[in-house]
């Protein structure tokens, strides 16, 4: 049994109740076999044992009072996974599905995603099983203030700089930042995704979706294809999906689907983004409302099944949304590229099937790195007490995403897996972190 296989078996036994973390670790570790074969220094320094174990796991209760005067208690998490190349960086997810395994999976992925950006940021993730949906502003504020009362003991601009994620938008970041400032009595860039009036960055809201398209465009061009004129299926209806749709349309593609937690829409004429923004960002309603704006569109209840014919698929909703059966439908319909806008939205089985069929596949740790890259750019602006223009940030973002594609493509080719961007992303992200860990000694 190889060193990698041995460590993977140990990891599975140690984390048996954390399937999401095991899935993420399996995908990364299996692709690193050729790296360990050619570089014995990684085994000699126990890199796998160290990189798969968080540097610190923080779990705490979050008590708050609802509008009826009743005390509610949620569970909060912060996993500070790896700081070899910079302070911990990763979002705070507020969703009922959040547990330690989910946060560890997200934090582990974040290590390599952050490494790929080329910026000095380590990997971390946090959140709570609190659900902001259906809560009043006062209840959300009460939760956020209680959450930050504990979390503030463990974070800081040069220690751990959290950001938003599912359920954590500008409102939640604002409440958390206010509480952090109140308790610590310091005004620093400790959270990213802040409001523009108090330290936020232009283009941060658009960054993940725009970055997804910049990398997809680079991948397609390198393989003799073009996003211009392509028919695109998008899942999700949050920031990533909305701004991926916006940039795809701007680049000349036609996006025909979007989906939320209750159903999905198909618009053969192309998604009306103004309608989507009004429904989702202004009215905060479900996609069922879309038909009121576009009567010729279709609304389907339930999970989006990727049955619509497309050239490019962009899963932008949540983990494991695209399964093996979905992959078969994409293949049958002639899809030639899939790029992950969400974190690990494609199951391992589906990923293998898509790659085996010859479909270009860009993994989330590379394809959706635009969000964290722009968060790091926000950190830079905060450190310098500067504010860059939208065009400046967007240009830096595009440059970062194109370089990510070049680096993962080169890494895959170097180790005999040309065109396998999953392997390339894992290797390129891993080597930078692993080499830094060795240079810093056993810590």
Please describe what each predicted stretch is.
Residues 2-24, 219, 331-443:
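Adenosine-phosphate binding glycine-rich loop
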Residues 12-16, 30-38, 108-112, 133, ...:
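Generic secondary-structure signature for well-ordered alpha-helical cores
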Residues 103-107, 176, 212-220, 244, ...:
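Buried hydrophobic packing segments
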Residues 2, 16, 20-23, 27, ...:
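Conserved active-site and cofactor/substrate-binding residues in soluble primary-metabolism enzymes
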Residues 263-361, 366:
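Rossmann-like adenosine-cofactor binding region
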Residues 159-163, 186-191, 257-260, 299, ...:
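General beta-strand structural signal in soluble alpha/beta enzymes
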């Amino acid at each position: 049994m190889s060193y990698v296989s041995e460590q993977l078996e140990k990891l599975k036994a140690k984390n048996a109740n954390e399937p999401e973390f095991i899935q993420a670790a399996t995908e990364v570790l299996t692709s690193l076999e050729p790296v360990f074969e050619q570089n014995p220094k990684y085994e000699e320094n126990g890199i796998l044992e160290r990189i798969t174990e968080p540097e610190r796991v923080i779990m705490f209760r979050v008590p708050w009072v609802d509008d009826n005067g009743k005390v509610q208690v949620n569970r909060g998490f912060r996993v500070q996974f790896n700081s070899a190349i910079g302070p911990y960086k990763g979002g705070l997810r507020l969703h009922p599905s959040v547990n330690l395994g989910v946060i560890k999976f997200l934090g582990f992925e974040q290590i390599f995603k952050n490494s790929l950006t080329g910026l000095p940021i380590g990997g971390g993730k946090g959140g709570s099983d609190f659900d902001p949906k259906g809560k009043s502003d006062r209840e959300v504020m009460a939760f956020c203030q209680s959450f930050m009362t504990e979390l503030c003991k463990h974070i800081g601009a040069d220690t751990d700089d959290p950001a938003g994620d599912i359920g954590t938008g500008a409102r939640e970041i604002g409440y958390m930042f206010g509480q952090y400032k109140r308790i610590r009595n310091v005004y620093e860039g400790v959270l990213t995704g802040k409001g523009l009036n108090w330290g936020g960055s232009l283009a941060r809201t658009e960054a993940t979706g725009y970055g997804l398209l910049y990398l997809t465009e680079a991948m397609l061009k390198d393989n003799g294809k073009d996003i211009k004129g392509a028919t695109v299926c998008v899942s999700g209806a949050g920031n990533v999906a909305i701004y991926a749709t916006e940039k795809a349309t701007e680049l000349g593609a036609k996006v025909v689907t979007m989906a939320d937690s209750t159903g999905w829409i198909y618009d053969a004429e192309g998604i009306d983004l103004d309608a989507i923004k009004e429904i989702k960002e202004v009215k905060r309603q479900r996609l069922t409302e879309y038909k009121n704006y576009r009567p010729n569109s279709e609304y389907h209840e339930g999970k989006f099944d990727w049955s619509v014919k497309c050239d490019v698929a962009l899963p932008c909703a949540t983990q494991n949304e695209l399964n093996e059966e979905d992959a078969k439908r994409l293949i049958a319909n002639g899809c030639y590229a899939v790029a992950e806008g969400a974190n690990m939205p494609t199951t391992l089985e589906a990923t293998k099937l898509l790659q085996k069929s010859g479909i270009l596949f860009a993994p989330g740790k590379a394809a959706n790195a635009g969000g964290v890259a722009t968060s790091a750019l926000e950190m830079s602006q905060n450190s310098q007490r500067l504010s860059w223009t939208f065009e400046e940030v967007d240009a830096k973002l595009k440059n970062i995403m194109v370089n990510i594609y070049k680096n993962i493509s080169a890494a895959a080719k170097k180790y005999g897996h040309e065109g396998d961007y999953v392997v390339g992303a894992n290797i390129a992200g891993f080597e930078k972190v692993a080499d830094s860990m060795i240079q810093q000694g056993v810590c």
